[in-house]
Each structure stands twice: as structure tokens, then as C-alpha cells.
Amino acid sequence: MMITIVVLAGGMLACTSPHTSSGRTPEAEQMLTELKEVSRQNHFLFGHHDDPVYGIGWDGDENRSDVKSVCGDYPAMMSFDLGRIELGGDKNLDNVPIERLRREIIAQYERGGMVSLSWHTDNPVTGKDAWDVSDSTVVASVLPGGAQHDKFMGWMGTIADFMNSLTTSDGRKVPVLFRPWHEHTGSWFWWGQALCSATEYKALWRMTYEFMQQKGVKHLLYAYSPGTEPNNTAEYLERYPGDDIIDLIGFD
């Protein structure tokens, strides 16, 4: 049975799917349970990207949030991006210091909120950003046997290390809604519709999931999140990686 959940005010509709032998942490299981309850009650969670790190007329201030300034509290869902973390720098692609990012993710969880993470990783073939679509072989190149596979595994290792560092003071791993390879029904990212086959895209997803499992990253819920291009269910699910690795489906 598919359960519709409105997760973000930005438009993400998600559906839980059966997910066997995941070995999720209790905290990740609890987050999924709470999302199901949101759906059952026909409620939604309001979210805001990079909420506590910059806003209208400010950047980098501590203990600040445009949403809190207007509504009196932080948003239920915050999203952040992991882009450029894979390169080993000290800031992500939104110019947020990595240590600040880690701290805000943990703080959001400890105040009772949820966190979603996307990953606009750089193009491993050209060295440019995720929006560089000048080469249509990038996905194939990072899959097993591809020319960029080893480099990309190193990048994913850095992301896995960051995920595993999201730990509270009492040792709990912060549960995260992870939505890599999003908006793939468009062609503005190197993993987009015109840049790889459906088989390659599914393989990219499965490789990502299996790598995180091998690295002991058990506190993630995985979200399949196409753009708004699909006109019907068949188009929407054309590149769906499978119920055994996907926890939620949505729109980006």
C-alpha cells in the first residue's frame, strides 16, 4: 500500500514503500513512522532550505532563522546540500562551512525537527559543477568498470564519513532524508534524462545505496525525487530504482 505524505512546503510529495532488511537505526525507523503518521492525519510539514545559515539581509549569523522570525519557531523540515563536501574542502556549494552544516543538522534533530539532504556533486569527468552537461558519458564513467569509478568511490566515501559524523552528544545518529540524483527527469544535471539511460540511472542509485550500506550508514531514508516533467505514472516510474532501496517517492 502506498501512503501519500506532503513532506515539504516546497512541493515534495512522498510515498513510503516496503523496504526489507534495511538494518535502519531506531531513529530512522522512527522518522519513517512519523512521516506515515503525518500522512494518516492529512497534515504536512513546512520546510526551508538552509534555514539557519543565511536569509534576507543576513548571512552566517548564529541562532537566526527567517522562518522563526516570522512564525516564532524553526521549520519542521530543514534541507541542506552536500555538494563540494566530496572534494574535501571546508565549505559546501552554498558556501556554508562544513562544521556549521554538521552542527545545524544535529541541532535541528535535537529540537525535534527533520533534515533532508541533497547532493549536487561536481561533474567527475569535467571537474565542473553538477549543471555541466557537456558530456553524456558521466554516469557510465562512475559505474563499476568506468574510468571515473575509483575517483567517484572516493567522493562517496567522503560523503559517507560526513553522514556517519552526524552524531548527537549521547551517540545517536541523526536520521536523514537523503535525496541524491534528484530532478533526473530534466536534463540540467549530469545524471539527467538525456545524459544517461534508465539502466545506468538505476545502477547509479543502487551503487550509491549499496556503498552507504557497506560503510555502515544506516540512518538514512532514501527518496526518489523526479522533477515535474512526467505526464503520467509510467513516465514518473521509468527510472525508479526499486522498492528494496527506496523509502519515499516525491517531486522536486
Description of each model-found segment:
Residues F178, W205, K218-E235, G250:
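Cell-envelope/glycan interface and biosynthesis
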Residues M78-F80, Y236-D252:
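Aromatic- and acid-rich polysaccharide-binding/catalytic face
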Residues E29-M31, W58-V67, E99-R103, T158-F162, ...:
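Alpha-helical scaffolding within the catalytic cores
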Residues M1-I3:
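Bacterial N-terminal signal peptides that target proteins for export
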Residues G83, L87-K218:
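Substrate-binding cleft of extracellular glycoside hydrolase catalytic domains
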Residues P18-M77, G83, G88-N95:
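N-terminal module-boundary/linker segments of secreted carbohydrate-active enzymes
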Residues L13-A14:
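C-terminal motif of bacterial Sec signal peptides marking the signal peptidase cleavage site
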Residues G47-H49, S79-D81, S116-H120, R179-W181, ...:
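A cross-family glycoside hydrolase active-site/sugar-binding cleft signature
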